[in-house]
């Protein structure tokens, strides 16, 4: 059964910095021109602003493909959609209908008006922001925790707590295929070419299936412990995985080899996001900061301070703006302010 990363303890490595790197990780010498340029940008754009979205903690944030809207899914059983106006998020609508927590959501890859939510109520719902209505409710067999939309827009894959992944036709809203796995399935994703399907699992492996045949292609031993999350870079060159060992590993898509690791976090890596140009990778955990690294060197580019563990991060598809949401469960902070907010980093300091 898939286990939320929040339930995991600190890294077995227990250290950050080069000393905790796996043997195959490499350290570069001196910051690149890109790193220096982005650091200069963030020095003037290091402001984080928070926006009230929900009445309980936010589990998932995602941008529409055109970057005009940000959606969030929450423990309060709703989704919210914001419009990005200059340097602020303006709440557009709240989407109700689920009977349990909205654990993950994603947008259609090329239609900026459609998004889909996965819930513990054993359904997924497709929403249209133009009508603000649910255009389809699809019943599934279990409590849903992971969802992704295929790059060609034709299929939605949803994973549940019982390690079943269901493939749903995005037009007919009917199940096309269903796979029961014998291992703990964590995050799921197609590759950018739409011809392979990737799963991260509780044994530290990345399982790759052909698509649409769903035949096993390869299993990669990526990490010594639970492999939690996976993201593909928009350029199609790399994918990254995050693990309970607190490491992020970067993989060459074509060669399926690990090219570098990022080891500045101490806790299980719960969420990853590549910037629109594929040059930055944000990773977050129960550490009270989000690490922003240069993809090509692994160098630290910036860190975003947080007051609590981070559930979800998402780079804007066109700008160096990072949306994220944190956990308020420890109650150390003013819960009325902290609960249910989405945060936006990269805003001008004088905004």
From Swiss-Prot:
Residues with N-acetylalanine modification: 2
Main location, first listed in the record: nucleus
Family matches, as Gene3D superfamilies: YVTN repeat-like/Quinoprotein amine dehydrogenase (2.130.10.10)
GO MF annotation list: RNA binding
Segments of this protein annotated with the region Disordered: 1-20
A Gene Ontology term for the protein's cellular component: transcription export complex
Coiled coil spans: none
Location in or out of the cell: Nucleus; Nucleus speckle
Keywords, sorted A to Z: Acetylation, mRNA processing, mRNA splicing, mRNA transport, Nucleus, Repeat, RNA-binding, Transport, WD repeat
WD repeat start and end residues: 53-94, 97-137, 139-178, 180-221, 222-261, 264-303
SUPFAM superfamilies: WD40 repeat-like (SSF50978)
Subunit composition and interactions: Component of the THO subcomplex, which is composed of THOC1, THOC2, THOC3, THOC5, THOC6 and THOC7. The THO subcomplex interacts with DDX39B to form the THO-DDX39B complex which multimerizes into a 28-subunit tetrameric assembly. Component of the transcription/export (TREX) complex at least composed of ALYREF/THOC4, DDX39B, SARNP/CIP29, CHTOP and the THO subcomplex; in the complex interacts with THOC2. TREX seems to have a dynamic structure involving ATP-dependent remodeling.
Function according to Swiss-Prot or TrEMBL: Component of the THO subcomplex of the TREX complex which is thought to couple mRNA transcription, processing and nuclear export, and which specifically associates with spliced mRNA and not with unspliced pre-mRNA. Required for efficient export of polyadenylated RNA and spliced mRNA. The THOC1-THOC2-THOC3 core complex alone is sufficient to bind export factor NXF1-NXT1 and promote ATPase activity of DDX39B. (Microbial infection) The TREX complex is essential for the export of Kaposi's sarcoma-associated herpesvirus (KSHV) intronless mRNAs and infectious virus production.
Protein name in the entry: THO complex subunit 3
Organism whose genome encodes this protein: Homo sapiens (Human)
Gene of this entry: THOC3
